[in-house]
Each structure stands twice: as C-alpha cells, then as structure tokens.
C-alpha cells in the first residue's frame, strides 16, 4: 500500500513538473508596443523614484497577467494584453493562466 502511494505521488509530481515546464507563460511572450508605452509612462510618472518605478512595473505586470483571463479587470486590458483582449487569439489560448483559469 505505501509503495503504491509513493509511486503514484511521484508520477503525479513528475507529470506536474513536465506540464509546468512545457506550458507557455505570459513572461515568455514578447511585450506588445502598447505595454512598452505603459511602462514608459510609469517611468515618467515616477520622476526618478526607483521604488515607485518598481511598484508601477509590478502593478503593470500583475494586471497584464490578470487581464489574460479577465478582460474587464481594468479599462486598459486591451492595451496590456492585446493577445487576449478583446478577443482571445490562438497564442492566448495556449497560455498557462488561460488554460488553468
């Protein structure tokens, strides 16, 4: 009984690792021009404050990822993630967050 449970857990764990490595992630996609412009605006608004830039970049990154599954999250989702908003493209459908969401 114990051996079979250990083997089952090992197989499930390996399957998870393989799927995770092969899944397309948001970070793997090239940044769209509209997202790059949003980052430039964040730098401009931070006025040289590196901490504010970091916070703004993290918010943009989080919103980009969250917009992939929910285009109504923020009004600028179509700019942050044009792959998925307003219409999901084939690339969008391959993303790990879209498949699991």
Curated annotation (Swiss-Prot):
Post-translational modification: Contains 3 disulfide bonds.
Molecular-function GO term, any one: toxin activity
Gene Ontology CC annotations of this record: extracellular region
Signal sequence segment: 1-23
UniProtKB keywords: Disulfide bond, Secreted, Signal, Toxin
Subcellular location: Secreted
Keyword Protein biosynthesis: no
Main location as per UniProt: secreted
Tissues of expression: Expressed by the venom gland.
Family assignment from sequence similarity: Belongs to the scoloptoxin-10 family.
Protein name, as recorded: U-scoloptoxin(10)-Sm2a
Species of origin: Scolopendra morsitans
